[in-house]
Amino acid sequence: MNEQQRLASQQVNSSTKKEEKDYSKYFESVYQPPSLKDAKKRGKEEVKIERDFGLPEEFRNFGTGRKFYIRTYGCQMNEHDTEVMAGIFTALGYEPTFSTEDADVVLLNTCAIRENAENKVFGELGHLKSLKRRNPDLLIGVCGCMSQEESVVNKIMQKNQHVDMVFGTHNIHRLPYILKDAMFSKETVVEVWSKEGDVIENLPKVRRGDIKAWVNIMYGCDKFCTYCIVPYTRGKERSRRPEDIIQEIRHLAANGYKEITLLGQNVNAYGKDFEDIEYGLGDLMDELRKVDIARIRFTTSHPRDFDDHLIEVLGKGGNLVEHIHLPVQSGSTEMLKIMARKYSREHYLELVRKIKEAIPNAVLTTDIIVGFPNETDEQFEETMSLYREVGFDTAFTFIYSPREGTPAAKMKDNVPMEVKKERLQRLNALVNKLAIEKNDRYKGQIVEVLVDGESKNNPEVLAGYTRTNKLVNFVAPKSLIGQLVKVKVTDAKTWSLNGELVEEPIEVE
C-alpha cells in the first residue's frame, strides 16, 4: 500500500541510557535476532516515558539527496508506524518516492497475523532481488511484526541475502542508527528487540492526510489468545500517559483534523498497567469528549475488557461515534475456551445488550475465524446464529491461519480445507445478506458525512464516511473535501451508500 507523505520537522534521538534497564547490548551488535521464548515473558520492569529526543548532530543531512519508499502491510498500527518512520526519514533529509525504482531505501513494514500476509512480503522480496542487482547501493529493509518472528528472520538470512537490514516493532526510534549500520556493513544488520522498550513520545510523523489521524494510546497485548502472534510481536501492554494523548489530540484539532482513531492492539485495556492512578479507556474518552474535534473512534477492542464505565461514557455521544468494532471470533463457548478468549457466548451477548441499551443507534462490526482446529458443524452453526442474533452490520472473516510459536499451531486439526472454505462461503453469504439489509434502512435518511476525497471508482464523485463508518458516494464540489456535510441517501449497496448533497458544510460545536 502506497503512502502519501508530507514534510515533517522533528526527529528522534536514539540515546537510550536507562537507570534500571541496560540495552547497550543492542547497540554494540548488528546481529540481535528475535526470540519468541523471550517475547512471551511478562516482567515487572518499570516502563519509562521518554520525551527528550532530538536528532543527533551526526545525522544532520544524513539522507540529503536520497529517497525512501515504504510499503505497508496489515493493520492501522502498522500504518501509523509507517507515518513515524516517514517522519524519521524526512528529518534525516530523505525525500519520499512512490516508486521502488527511484528509491535509495526500500522498507517493507510487515504483518504477521496470517500466513497470506507473510507470503506477500516474501513475494515482494523476490521482486526486489532483481532491483538490487541493477542497483547494488539500494538498501532493502524488513521491519514490523514479521521481523519479530525467529522463523522469518532465519528465512531472510538463508534465502533473502539481498536484504540489508531487519528490525522490529520495539525499536523504530533506532532507525537512524540502523540505516547507518546497514549503509556501511557488509552483512545483514539484524536488530530486533524481543523485549519491548519504553514508551517513546514526541516521535516525528508524516501523516497520510490532514482530515483523519491515528493516535496510539497503548502498545502490546497480554491476552495470549491461542491462535494469535500479536502478544509475541508487540510485547506487553504499555499505556501512554493521558496528558500526552490529550495534548496530541488537541494539537491535531488545532491543525484542522476532524476525526481521530485511538489505536491499540487491545485498546480497551488502556490504563490497566498504571500503578499510580486508576484510569481507563472510559476516563480517557470522557475527557476527549471535551476536545473541539468532530469525531473520536477507537480500535481494536476486546470483549473481556469492555467495562460498564466505558459503555456509560460512549452513551453520552457528542464527538464519540456510534460505531464499535467488537471481535467475537466464534459464537461457540467451547471454541472460545480453546481460543483462550476468556469470555463465553452468553457474556458476549450480554455485553451487546448493554451497549445497545446505552447506545440505541450503535452499529456493531466484528472479526470471525472459521475452521479453527477441530471446530464442529454444530460449533460453526453457533457462530452463524450469534451473527444473526447480534445483527452485525458487517464482519472481517477469515479461515484460521496457524502461526508458528502459538499454542494453536500445535493443535491437531481434523477440519478439511474444503470444509473450511465451505463454512467461510456460508458465513460471507450471511454477512453480505445482513449488510445490504442494514444499508437498505438508510434509504431516504439524511446522514452526516465527513468528506475524505474523490471516489476511487469515479473522480467526479466524492466519498466519505458517516459516524457509523458507512461509506457514502455523492456528487458535490471538491471544495467540500475535509468538511462535514449532510447527504440524503438515495441508494444502498452491500458495502456503500449513494446519496445527494443536502447541506454544506456543518459547523462543529
UniProtKB/Swiss-Prot annotation:
It is found in: Cytoplasm. Residues 440-503 form the TRAM domain. It is an enzyme of class 2 (transferase). The gene is miaB. Its main location: cytoplasm. Residues 66-184 form the MTTase N-terminal domain. PANTHER family: CDK5 REGULATORY SUBUNIT-ASSOCIATED PROTEIN 1, MITOCHONDRIAL TRNA METHYLTHIOTRANSFERASE CDK5RAP1. Keywords: 4Fe-4S, Cytoplasm, Iron, Iron-sulfur, Metal-binding, S-adenosyl-L-methionine, Transferase, tRNA processing. Its EC number is 2.8.4.3. SUPFAM superfamilies: Radical SAM enzymes. One of its GO terms (cellular component) is cytosol. SMART domains: Elp3. This is tRNA-2-methylthio-N(6)-dimethylallyladenosine synthase. Belongs to the methylthiotransferase family. MiaB subfamily. [4Fe-4S] cluster 1 binds at residues 75, 111, 145. It comes from Bacillus thuringiensis (strain Al Hakam). It holds the Pfam family UPF0004. GO terms for molecular function: 4 iron, 4 sulfur cluster binding; metal ion binding; N6-isopentenyladenosine methylthiotransferase activity. Catalyzes the methylthiolation of N6-(dimethylallyl)adenosine (i(6)A), leading to the formation of 2-methylthio-N6-(dimethylallyl)adenosine (ms(2)i(6)A) at position 37 in tRNAs that read codons beginning with uridine. [4Fe-4S] cluster 2 binds at residues 221, 225, 228. Its cofactor is [4Fe-4S] cluster. It catalyses: N(6)-dimethylallyladenosine(37) in tRNA + (sulfur carrier)-SH + AH2 + 2 S-adenosyl-L-methionine = 2-methylsulfanyl-N(6)-dimethylallyladenosine(37) in tRNA + (sulfur carrier)-H + 5'-deoxyadenosine + L-methionine + A + S-adenosyl-L-homocysteine + 2 H(+). Binds 2 [4Fe-4S] clusters. One cluster is coordinated with 3 cysteines and an exchangeable S-adenosyl-L-methionine. Monomer. The keyword DNA repair does not apply.
